[in-house]
C-alpha cells in the first residue's frame, strides 16, 4: 500500500492507494464511536457493500446507508435533500461521519452533503472508479449540478481521508477505465512531460490493469493533483490549470444533456479543442497535437461527436464557466507539452473558428 499525504494550511489527510485495502485497520479509526452514513453507488456489487457494512457496524454508534444511482441527472438538489433527510431524521450530530463510496458523482454529492449538514461534518471517501481515484476524491471540491450548468452549486470541503482500492477497478467496463485515463493524460500535459511519456509507454499495461502499472499511474496522478491543491486550495490561482480541457468539456456535457458523453470523453474532446487553440496562438506544434491525439486514441477514449453541435451554442455554454471573470473567458492552454498557463481574453472569433473547424 502506498500513502500520499495532503498537508494543507488547516488540515492534513492521507490518501491510501493499493489493492484490497478496505479493511478494519485502515477504516476503524475513522468510524469508531461515530454515527455513520454510507452514501454508496448503485453500480457497486451488493456483496461488497454488505461486507463493508458488516465490517464497520460493531465500531459505529449508529449506521445508515443510502444508495445513489450515479447519473449526472441525479447529482441534484433532490438527491442532496434525500441524504440530508436521513441525517436529520436519524438525529446525526455534528460529530458524525459521511462516507462516500463510489465514482466521481457519489464522491461529489457525499462531500457536498457533509459540507452543508450542520455547517460542515467530516467525510471519508472510498473512490471506486479510476476517474474518482485520480481526480474527484482529491482536493475537496464538492458539488451538485444545476440544470444550466455542471457543478454550479458546491463548496470546498476536504475529506478526512481517501482510500483508493484498486481492486474495485477489476469489475469496471473498459469505457470507465478510459474515462479515468483522460484525466491522467491531462495531468501529464499540464505538469510533467516525463509522466506523459511514461503513459505513452505503459498505456496497454494500464488498460489491462496490471497492478504495478495501475498503482504507479494512480500515485503519480494524485501527486500532481495534490501539488496544485497544496499551492492553491481554493483555486484562486494555479489550481485552475487542472481545468485544462474542462471549459470546453463541461459545455459539451451540458449540450449533450449529460447523456451523450461521460466526463472523461467530454474532457478528452475538450483537450483536443484546447490543443488546437494552443497551436493557433503559437505555443505548440501540429506534431504535438497529433502525439496527444494518438495517446487519447490508444487509451480507447471515444472522442466522436455523437450529435451535431452548434458552435455558437457551445460557446454560450462555455460562457457559463465558473472560472470566467465578468465577460472574460479564462482558458487553460499549453505553452508546451508538460507546461500549461491560463490565457484570458482570447478573441471569440478565434474560438468559434476552432469550434467550426473541429466539431
Briefly describe each language-model feature range:
Residues 1-96:
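ATP/NTP phosphate-donor binding region
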Residues 66, 100-101, 126:
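Structural motif
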Residues 202-312:
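Active-site segments that bind and position negatively charged phosphate/pyrophosphate groups
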Residues 70-71, 101-103, 244-245:
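Glycine-rich beta-strand-to-loop/alpha-helix junction loops that act as flexible
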Residues 105-112, 133-134, 251:
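Short glycine/serine/threonine-rich phosphate/pyrophosphate-binding segments
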Amino acid at each position: 500500500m502506498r500513502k500520499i499525504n495532503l498537508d494543507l494550511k488547516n488540515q492534513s489527510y492521507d490518501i491510501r492507494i493499493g489493492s484490497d485495502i478496505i479493511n478494519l485497520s485502515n477504516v476503524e479509526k475513522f468510524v469508531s464511536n461515530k454515527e455513520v452514513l454510507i452514501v454508496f453507488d448503485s453500480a457497486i456489487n451488493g456483496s461488497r457493500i454488505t461486507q463493508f457494512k458488516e465490517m464497520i457496524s460493531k465500531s459505529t454508534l449508529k449506521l445508515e446507508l443510502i444508495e445513489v444511482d450515479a447519473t449526472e441527472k441525479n447529482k441534484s438538489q433532490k438527491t442532496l435533500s434525500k441524504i440530508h433527510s436521513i441525517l436529520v431524521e436519524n438525529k446525526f450530530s455534528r460529530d458524525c461521519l459521511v462516507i462516500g463510496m463510489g465514482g466521481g458523482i457519489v464522491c461529489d454529492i457525499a462531500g457536498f452533503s457533509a459540507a452543508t449538514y450542520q455547517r460542515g461534518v467530516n467525510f471519508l471517501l472510498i473512490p471506486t472508479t479510476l476517474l474518482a481515484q485520480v481526480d474527484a476524491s482529491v482536493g475537496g471540491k464538492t458539488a451538485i449540478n444545476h440544470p444550466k450548468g455542471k457543478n454550479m452549486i458546491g463548496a470546498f470541503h476536504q475529506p478526512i481521508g481517501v482510500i483508493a482500492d484498486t481492486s474495485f477497478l477489476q469489475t469496471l467496463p473498459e469505457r470507465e477505465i478510459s474515462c479515468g485515463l483522460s484525466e491522467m493524460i491531462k495531468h501529464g500535459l499540464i505538469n510533467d512531460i516525463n509522466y506523459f511519456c511514461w503513459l505513452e509507454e505503459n498505456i496497454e499495461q494500464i488498460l489491462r490493469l496490471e497492478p504495478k502499472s495501475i498503482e504507479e499511474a494512480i500515485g503519480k496522478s494524485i501527486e500532481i493533483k495534490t501539488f496544485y491543491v497544496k499551492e492553491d486550495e481554493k483555486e484562486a490561482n494555479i489550481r485552475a490549470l487542472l481545468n485544462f480541457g474542462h471549459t470546453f468539456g463541461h459545455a459539451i456535457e451540458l449540450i449533450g444533456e449529460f447523456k451523450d458523453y461521460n466526463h472523461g470523453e467530454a474532457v478528452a474532446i475538450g483537450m483536443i479543442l484546447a490543443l488546437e487553440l494552443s497551436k493557433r496562438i503559437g505555443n505548440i506544434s501540429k506534431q504535438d497535437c497529433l502525439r496527444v491525439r494518438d495517446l487519447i486514441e490508444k487509451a480507447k477514449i471515444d472522442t466522436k461527436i455523437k450529435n451535431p453541435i452548434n458552435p455558437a451554442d457551445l460557446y454560450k455554454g462555455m460562457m457559463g464557466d465558473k472560472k470566467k471573470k465578468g465577460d472574460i473567458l479564462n482558458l487553460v492552454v499549453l505553452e508546451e507539452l508538460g507546461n500549461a498557463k491560463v490565457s484570458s481574453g482570447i478573441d471569440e472569433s478565434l474560438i468559434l473558428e476552432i469550434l467550426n473547424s473541429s466539431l
